[in-house]
């Protein structure tokens, strides 16, 4: 008791001084939290929340005062307090500082060179901050929000990789010596590995940090979250700020264009291959599968097979649905109608047939459904929920979109529901020629109507007028749709309402498998047609910069730069030891087979058309002359081989061999299209992309079968020795020298030394000589 009384008296005496009283009554947050932590025995229930609370104060951290003064860190920068000259009571010579002091140290202090490294390490966080600044916030509405728990991506990435692919990339980038054998992903995307190595070379980062950065760059961080509305990653990272159970914050988030562009690119490629397969007279289904499996798309620096992208996507567009049906992939319960995407929500209709007369003469049958059904529809920027029953569109609610998209979406929903007077009497402008394709196939009447409204704006409005026009109720002004697609119309269309926000597509948990006919019609197990080739919009002139069409039938669709690189890559893969490989054909001087290789034929459409005969004469003469004299380079022969396919023709040669895209190669001269180095003959560069030349003889990781040739040893290069194939070695006599292709474009001279000599006794010597002669 006496001790407490003594402390109280001392406290009263100290409080007579104003400064001392303030120091004893006002403590720092750091002191308080430290005191609470070490004086309580209970476990902190929410350490993250306490840390955030502590860091929210003005000066939550401490800093060495001497270091701040030596580094000339100001107390204030851009009206933001960095530190104050108040000593921390828990640590001597330290003052109170704010978190902004750290930012100033990193970006403006003596270690400012680290700013770029810090930006790279926290690239995903800085990107999130930039996207946050681009958001256009709108009104806050209070309403009940129907949220669904779904698996969504919470981080937008430039290119998405699987977990196993990210691990392979980390190992090959950071631990090259300990990395496992190259997977197919590494072989196809080795350029990405080299890019990552050069990106992080000579930077003050440990490997654990770089591994974390690689994972953040390619991992979209999928989570199960209660969501509503669109599920783009740019929106999901802010879903906590966009709505709750009883409120919605309207906002336009950033990053929409890139996602939409990728979706449109894949739809365009699928549409091209579907139309190309449909143009074939027979086996359209098998042709479509061939086209899909021979096509790949480049996303960022990663090249992905179109087949993989189709099976992974949840896109329900008609072109993607047809391609997925051809591959046998599962789909949700979706269907397509022209360019409109549909998903059934409820109901099950019974199919009924009816008749409409064309020009009052020809009777054409069409089908409709007698029971009530509800659907979700999507066309470009507009979405809708609607109900159909019998031959009518009972009601429709359209969300978002511009006026033109809303008009066309409503028109397609009317045709889908067989609504309007034109399903009783056909328009007078529809003729008999509109009822069939150029190949004579009959077009169903609903697709005839789809083509009809595409011909003119008058046809579209005539169909909408058949819906019926009513006076807009003043109390519903702004929620009804006029004939021009606007919201605030005096006269509106019957039973058509508009809402401001976009309607989200309901998730389809049940998966089905579709069958694809040779007429390219996808149908389910009950025989219902889900998508047809007639659903595809008219073909547009689309250029593909990041798509590789390997199939010869699709040569007209190729991006020529990529096609040239792929063509040379295919030729380089023929540098093997097989009977039909390029070295064997050269040794046998089988020029006809050499000029008609499938890989040469594949590149034939890429040659400048008006000069192909002249180029063929020059290229064939170069090949035959060099092979005959024995002084040739396989790298140079590969360079001119694509120009040898056509029949030779006389003409003036200007010294360069041009492709149809005006790029060229020049015999004996390196350029950007084709280059190689004698110092490193293991690689050929096409448009800056390194293509590895196949190895036949090498170290323990390579095929050493040629080093095990019984009775042969490697000797000095002798250009007079005949060039033979591996199969002809049995005819070589004792003491004779022959030249043999050993890989990487190299030719070595071998000498027959004995008839019965153990192969194992020559292994070490042969491999050593080969390595020394390289």
From Swiss-Prot:
Gene Ontology MF terms in the entry: RNA binding; RNA-directed RNA polymerase activity
Keywords (A to Z) from UniProt: Cap snatching, Eukaryotic host gene expression shutoff by virus, Eukaryotic host transcription shutoff by virus, Host gene expression shutoff by virus, Host nucleus, Host-virus interaction, Inhibition of host RNA polymerase II by virus, mRNA capping, mRNA processing, Viral transcription, Virion
An annotated GO cellular component: host cell nucleus
BP-aspect Gene Ontology terms: 7-methylguanosine mRNA capping; cap snatching; DNA-templated transcription; symbiont-mediated suppression of host gene expression; symbiont-mediated suppression of host mRNA transcription via inhibition of RNA polymerase II activity; viral RNA genome replication
Compartments (UniProt record): Virion; Host nucleus
UniProt key word Repressor: no
Pfam family, one: Flu_PB2_2nd
Keyword field contains DNA damage: no
HAMAP family in alphabetical order: INV_PB2
Annotated family: Belongs to the influenza viruses PB2 family.
Task of the protein: Plays an essential role in transcription initiation and cap-stealing mechanism, in which cellular capped pre-mRNAs are used to generate primers for viral transcription. Recognizes and binds a wide range of cap structures of target pre-RNAs which are subsequently cleaved after 10-13 nucleotides by the viral protein PA. Plays a role in the initiation of the viral genome replication and modulates the activity of the ribonucleoprotein (RNP) complex.
Subunit structure: Influenza RNA polymerase is composed of three subunits: PB1, PB2 and PA. Interacts (via N-terminus) with PB1 (via C-terminus). Interacts with nucleoprotein NP (via N-terminus).
Record protein name field: Polymerase basic protein 2
Species for this entry: Influenza C virus (strain C/JJ/1950)
């Amino acid at each position: 008791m006496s001790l407490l009384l003594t402390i109280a008296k001392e406290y009263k005496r100290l409080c007579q001084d104003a400064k001392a009283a303030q120091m004893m009554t006002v403590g720092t947050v750091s002191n308080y939290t430290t005191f609470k932590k070490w004086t309580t025995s209970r476990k902190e229930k929410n350490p993250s929340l306490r840390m955030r609370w502590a860091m929210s104060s003005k000066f939550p951290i401490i800093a060495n005062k001497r270091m701040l003064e030596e580094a000339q860190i100001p107390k204030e920068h851009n009206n933001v307090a960095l530190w104050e000259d108040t000593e921390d009571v828990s640590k001597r010579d330290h003052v109170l500082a704010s978190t902004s002091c750290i930012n100033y140290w990193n970006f403006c202090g003596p270690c400012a060179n680290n700013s770029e490294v810090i930006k790279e390490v926290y690239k995903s966080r800085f990107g999130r901050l930039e996207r946050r600044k681009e958001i256009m916030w709108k009104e806050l509405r209070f309403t009940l929000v129907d949220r669904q728990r779904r698996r969504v991506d919470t981080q937008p990435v430039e290119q998405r990789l699987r977990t196993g692919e990210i691990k392979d990339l980390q190992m090959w980038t950071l631990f090259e010596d300990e990395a496992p054998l190259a997977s197919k992903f590494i072989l196809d995307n080795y350029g990405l590995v080299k890019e990552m190595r050069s990106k992080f070379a000579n930077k003050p980062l440990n490997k654990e940090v770089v591994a974390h950065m690689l994972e953040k760059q390619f991992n979209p961080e999928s989570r199960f979250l209660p969501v509503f509305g669109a599920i783009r990653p740019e929106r999901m990272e802010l879903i906590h700020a966009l709505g709750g159970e009883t409120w919605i914050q309207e906002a336009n988030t950033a990053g929409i264009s890139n996602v939409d562009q990728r979706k449109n690119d894949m739809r365009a490629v699928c549409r091209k291959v579907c139309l190309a397969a449909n143009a074939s007279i027979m086996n359209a289904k098998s042709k479509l599968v061939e086209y899909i499996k021979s096509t790949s798309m480049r996303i960022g620096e990663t090249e992905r097979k179109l087949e993989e992208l189709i099976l992974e996507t949840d896109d329900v567009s008609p072109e993607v649905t047809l391609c997925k049906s051809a591959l046998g992939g599962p789909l949700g319960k979706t269907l397509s109608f022209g360019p409109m995407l549909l998903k059934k929500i409820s109901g099950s209709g019974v199919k009924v047939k009816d008749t409409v007369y064309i020009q009052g003469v020809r009777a054409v049958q069409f089908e409709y459904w007698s029971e009530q059904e509800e659907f979700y529809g999507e066309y470009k920027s507009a979405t809708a929920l609607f109900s159909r029953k019998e031959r009518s569109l009972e009601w429709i609610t359209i969300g978002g979109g511009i006026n033109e998209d809303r008009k066309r979406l409503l028109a397609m929903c009317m045709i889908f529901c067989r609504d309007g007077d034109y399903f009783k009497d056909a328009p007078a402008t529809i003729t008999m020629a509109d009822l069939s394709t150029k190949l004579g196939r009959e077009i169903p009447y609903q697709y005839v109507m789809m083509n009809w409204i595409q011909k003119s704006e008058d046809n579209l409005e005539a169909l909408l007028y058949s819906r019926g026009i009513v006076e807009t109720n003043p109390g519903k002004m702004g929620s009804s749709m006029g004939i021009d697609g606007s919201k605030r119309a005096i006269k509106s269309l019957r039973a058509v309402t508009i809402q401001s926000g976009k309607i989200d597509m309901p998730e389809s948990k049940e998966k089905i498998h579709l069958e694809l006919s040779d007429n390219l019609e996808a149908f389910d197990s009950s025989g219902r047609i889900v998508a047809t080739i007639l659903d595809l919009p008219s073909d547009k002139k689309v250029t593909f910069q990041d798509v590789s069409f390997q199939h010869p039938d699709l040569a007209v669709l190729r991006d020529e730069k990529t096609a040239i690189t792929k063509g040379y890559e295919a030729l380089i893969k023929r540098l093997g030891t097989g009977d039909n490989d390029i070295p064997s054909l050269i040794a046998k001087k089988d020029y006809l087979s050499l000029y008609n290789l499938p890989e040469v034929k594949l590149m034939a459409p890429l040659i400048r058309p008006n000069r192909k005969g002249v180029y063929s004469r020059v290229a064939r003469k170069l090949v035959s002359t060099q092979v005959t004299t024995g002084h040739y380079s396989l790298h140079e022969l590969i360079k001119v081989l694509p120009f040898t396919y056509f029949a030779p023709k006389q003409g003036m040669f200007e010294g360069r061999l041009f492709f149809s895209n005006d790029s060229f190669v020049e015999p004996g001269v390196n350029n950007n299209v084709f280059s190689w180095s004698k110092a490193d003959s293991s690689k050929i560069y096409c448009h800056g992309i390194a293509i590895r030349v196949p190895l036949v003889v090498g170290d323990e990781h390579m095929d050493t079968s040629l080093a095990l040739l019984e009775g042969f040893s490697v000797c000095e290069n002798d250009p007079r020795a005949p060039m033979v194939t591996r199969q002809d070695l049995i005819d070589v006599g004792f003491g004779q020298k022959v030249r043999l292709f050993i890989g990487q474009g190299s030719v070595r001279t071998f000498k027959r030394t004995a008839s019965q000599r153990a192969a194992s006794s020559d292994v070490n010597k042969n491999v050593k000589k080969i390595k020394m002669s390289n």
